[in-house]
Swiss-Prot record:
Lineage, opening ranks: Bacteria, Pseudomonadati, Pseudomonadota, Alphaproteobacteria, Candidatus Pelagibacterales
Single biological process term from Gene Ontology: translation
Protein name as it appears in the record: Glutamyl-tRNA(Gln) amidotransferase subunit A
Residues at the active site: 76, 151, 175
UniProt subunit comment: Heterotrimer of A, B and C subunits.
E.C. no: 6.3.5.7
Length: 485
């Protein structure tokens, strides 16, 4: 096997099942590449020695009926992993070792996968560039000095750099789709309630959703099949008939109606994004789809709505971090002083900003003017999508308003950073599924993605559309391994 790490998940599983490669051989290959790639800063915690032991154990008693037989995988450090440090990219959780496993990761281990380690992310998933992490920013494998996107930046970087064959992220306002777009990979944000939130460090509970990130759509479908289960431990988990997404995957989308929302043609959109969208429409037509112009009139208000609702929920969720039961604790002269010092020293500046925004909009004098109004607008945004889906089967948009930007370019301009999520946040507010697929490059050769948005619980449909378009686009990620000396 020339280069195990460059294989897709589907290829890797086939080779392991055909006994062409062992789990130990596979795991060693990913560990070796991981050790050579530390300059990317993708890992917060490496669990390489345990991974090798588990791989050897699997090879001694293999079970090839499993969907991920002995496959090594690294996951975002927002998922609780029993007895393995889970930090959420924050100083305040730097010493936290969970006594339990998240449902999503448990589903993955149940299918035979092996944990390689925990991947870097923006602190508490608050960020669009992986620059807010206490453990330092992540480099994109696309080019030196480039952000990989966020908050699942470590996941996207590790995937594109072939440090893991697949991975999982979380998406609150675009945190799977935006980094996937920036790194030339595939990222699916499932319907809210499709994947359990149990054991995921919470940011905004009505928006957070776990999802798969992969090298191609087929791998994405397989991982979604594994992680999407009903869970009684999560009150927002929804019990519905789930598809066998990978088995039901088809490139036949003839006659599907795909909507193009006129409101997404925003002022100042770069020509390369306009051109990408136009090409995407042509690809969809070539696949046999019918293009329909639609209107989503209230999505213009999605960004301000999101940046009221999400910080409000974050300020409530993060109130639990006080230094008493677990995590970082600062010394204080009394209890109140200890609380103040722990939180001011333990949280980074972006997290503090969002806590303050959230506390403000929930305060008695401003609750009606901001939070309540935002929830009403959120309902209108959901209604816009409901109306659109009376005419179309899916919606096609760009994933992001630009290609990846340089590290440090937007750190002093929060509004500019927040605008990165302009095409992704409406989906979270409406609780819908959406997938980003690589579809082209800009003038510098940086990847650009297209987003396909579906009806609630219609992941199969958007996976099929993505699969058909992927075949037409024939995107090839150009990674030069610039970071390996």
């Amino acid at each position: 096997m020339s280069d195990i790490t460059s294989l897709t998940l589907t290829e890797l599983v086939k080779n392991i099942k055909d006994k062409k490669i062992s789990s130990e051989e596979t795991t060693k290959a990913f560990i070796d590449r991981g050790e050579k790639s530390r300059d990317l800063n993708t890992y917060i915690t490496e669990d390489f020695s345990n991974a090798l032991l588990k791989a050897k154990s699997f090879d001694q008693k293999p079970n090839f009926d499993l969907k991920l037989p002995g496959v090594p995988i690294a996951v975002k450090d927002l998922f609780c992993t029993k007895d393995v440090k889970t930090t959420a990219g924050s100083k305040i959780l730097n010493n936290f070792i969970p006594p339990y496993e998240s449902t999503v990761t448990q589903n993955i281990w149940n299918e035979g996968a092996i944990l390689l380690g925990k991947l870097n992310c923006d602190e508490f998933a608050m960020g669009s560039s992986n620059e807010t992490s206490f453990f330092g920013n992540v480099q994109s494998p696309i080019d030196k000095g480039l952000v990989p996107g966020g908050s699942s930046g470590g996941s996207a970087s590790a995937l594109a750099a072939n440090l893991t064959p697949i991975t999982i992220g979380t998406d609150t306002g675009g945190s799977i789709r935006q980094p996937a777009s920036f790194t030339g990979t595939v990222g699916l944000k499932p319907t809210y309630g499709s994947c359990s939130r149990y054991g995921i460090v919470a940011f905004a509970s009505s928006l957070d959703q776990a999802g798969p990130m992969s090298k191609d759509v087929k791998d994405c479908a397989l991982l979604q099949e594994i992680i999407s289960t009903y869970d009684e431990k999560d009150s927002t988990s929804i019990d519905f008939k789930r598809n066998e997404y990978s088995k039901e995957l088809t490139n036949n989308i003839k006659g599907k109606k795909i909507g193009i929302p006129k409101e997404y043609r925003v002022d100042g959109m770069p020509k390369e994004i306009e051109d990408l969208w136009t090409k995407g429409i042509e690809y969809a037509k070539d696949c046999g789809a019918e293009i329909v112009e639609i209107s989503l009139p209230h999505t213009n208000y999605a960004l301000p709505t999101y940046y009221i609702v999400a910080p409000a929920e974050a300020s409530s969720n993060l109130a639990r971090y006080d230094g008493v039961k677990y995590g970082f604790r600062s010394k204080g002269e009394n209890l109140i002083d200890m609380y103040e010092k722990t939180r001011s020293e333990g949280f980074g500046s972006e997290v503090q900003r969002r806590i303050m925004i959230g506390t403000y909009v929930l305060s008695s004098g401003y609750y009606d003017a901001y939070y309540l109004k935002a929830q009403k607008v959120r309902k209108l945004i959901k209604n816009d999508f409901d109306e659109a889906y009376k005419k179309v089967d899916a919606i096609l948009t760009p994933s992001t308003p630009s290609a990846a930007f340089k590290i440090g370019e937007k750190t002093n301009d929060p509004v500019s950073m927040y605008l990165n999520d302009i095409f992704t946040v409406p989906v979270n507010l409406a609780g819908l599924p959406a997938i980003s697929i690589p579809a082209g490059i800009d003038v510098k050769g940086y990847p650009l993605g297209l987003q396909i948005i579906g009806k609630a619980f219609d992941e199969q449909n958007i996976l099929n559309i993505a699969y058909a378009m992927e075949e037409k686009i024939q995107f090839k990620n150009k990674i030069t391994d610039w970071w390996i000396k």
